[in-house]
């Protein structure tokens, strides 16, 4: 894994950035929760309760994290769990041949699943914002080549789910 910080959503916030940063913090927390569920086999109710009571907006290792938009966090995690049997085959198709979803790192699976869910279901968020946010999250955990793969897969899904919004290549 990359040596970069896994703490991208901290520090001073301007008032007009607050909503975006609360959503960014919710996305990061959702990816971490999905990762925990994948690796540890934790159940959704336990993970949601743990993150909502101990992580969202808390001080962790001496760093104060922005409060996350809890409803947005819950929607992403619950939506991915609910729709995973639909999301995973779409991701398998979008990934390069020979690299099925189960073969890539668990953190990348979590990033791609959350991004795919948001692109398909959260039409209130512009597709370019979704792609950019999840690429930024991937940067916190993996090397540059892998973030390029995240960008390529999510761009492909954005064109599939939101062709009218994305326009021509």
Curated annotation (Swiss-Prot):
Involved in transcription antitermination. Required for transcription of ribosomal RNA (rRNA) genes. Binds specifically to the boxA antiterminator sequence of the ribosomal RNA (rrn) operons. GO terms for biological process: DNA-templated transcription termination; transcription antitermination. HAMAP family: NusB. SUPFAM superfamilies: NusB-like (SSF48013). One of its GO terms (cellular component) is cytosol. Keywords: RNA-binding, Transcription, Transcription antitermination, Transcription regulation. Belongs to the NusB family. InterPro entries: NusB-like_sf, NusB_fam, NusB_RsmB_TIM44. Residues 1-20 are annotated as: Disordered. GO terms for molecular function: RNA binding. It comes from Bradyrhizobium sp. (strain BTAi1 / ATCC BAA-1182). Pfam families: NusB. This is Transcription antitermination protein NusB.
């Amino acid at each position: 894994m990359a040596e970069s910080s896994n703490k991208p959503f901290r520090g001073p916030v301007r008032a007009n950035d607050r909503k975006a940063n609360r959503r960014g913090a919710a996305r990061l927390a959702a990816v971490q929760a999905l990762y925990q569920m994948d690796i540890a086999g934790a159940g959704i109710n336990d993970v949601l309760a743990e993150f909502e009571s101990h992580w969202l907006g808390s001080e962790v290792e001496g760093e104060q994290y922005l409060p996350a938009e809890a409803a947005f966090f819950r929607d992403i995690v619950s939506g991915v769990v609910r729709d995973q049997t639909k999301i995973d085959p779409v991701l398998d198709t979008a990934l390069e041949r020979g690299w099925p979803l189960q073969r890539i790192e668990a953190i990348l699976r979590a990033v791609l699943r959350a991004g795919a869910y948001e692109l398909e279901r959260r039409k209130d968020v512009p597709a370019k914002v979704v792609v950019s946010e999840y690429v930024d999250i991937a940067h916190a955990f993996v090397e540059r080549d892998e973030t390029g793969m995240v960008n390529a897969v999510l761009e492909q899904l954005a064109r599939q789910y939101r062709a009218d919004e994305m326009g021509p290549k």
